[in-house]
Amino acid sequence: MHAITNSGWVEVITGSMFSGKTEELLRRLRRAEIAGQDVAAVTPAVDDRYGEATLGSHAGRSWAATVVEPTAEGVASIPTLLNGEQVVAIDEANFFPAELVDVCQELAADGRRVVLSGTDQTFRGEPFEPVPQLMAIAEYVDKMRAICMQCGEPATRNQRLIEGEPAHYDDPTVMVGAEETYEARCRNCHVVRRE
């Protein structure tokens, strides 16, 4: 793979929950910091599982982050929050509105490396915008896989469980949770109730 070095670019790390997306994002941030690059991290206000101003992984690793409201206005404020950082990390991109795509384009055009992580599918197995749009404009895309909690195969789906049972198709899309409300599942074991 030829690395881009003369301009900004966009990287997307995606996949199901528990696939290591945030771990990979944190790894890239650590490498950028070791290389002497200034790093800024952003996380949505809806995800406070690991602390108010923290980008955190299920494995317990974390990074200080600026909390941004997941609104058009909040996303538009991201460039104004920066102080010359060359690397901008955005975790849980799926919780931000479509305006995030234009902001990432702007940051990359300004010569910055933009690294995003977020799941590309809802619990229904449908596209979770704006991540698919971000994947389309990105120079680099990595799709991570977890392990299916039912059969052990590679998992690419988010199984939402409510009181231990698969969620209904009509349940709300956004519901921040951890192991008690979601499991990684493969295509064959993924269930969405429609009755």
Curated annotation (Swiss-Prot):
Binding site for Zn(2+): C148, C151, C186, C189
GO terms for cellular component: cytoplasm
Subcellular compartments: Cytoplasm
Record keywords, A-Z: ATP-binding, Cytoplasm, DNA synthesis, Kinase, Metal-binding, Nucleotide-binding, Transferase, Zinc
List of residues binding ATP: G15, S16, M17, F18, S19, G20, K21, T22, D91, E92, A93, N94
Classification via PROSITE patterns: TK_CELLULAR_TYPE (PS00603)
Catalytic class of the enzyme: transferase
Keyword Cell inner membrane (UniProt): no
EC number(s) on file: 2.7.1.21
Any single GO BP term: thymidine metabolic process
MF terms in GO: ATP binding; thymidine kinase activity; zinc ion binding
Positions of transmembrane segments: none
List of catalytic residues: E92 (proton acceptor)
Pfam families per the UniProt record, alphabetical: TK (PF00265)
Cited NCBIfam families: PRK04296.1-1
Oligomeric and partner information: Homotetramer.
Protein name: Thymidine kinase
Organism the protein comes from: Halobacterium salinarum (strain ATCC 700922 / JCM 11081 / NRC-1) (Halobacterium halobium)
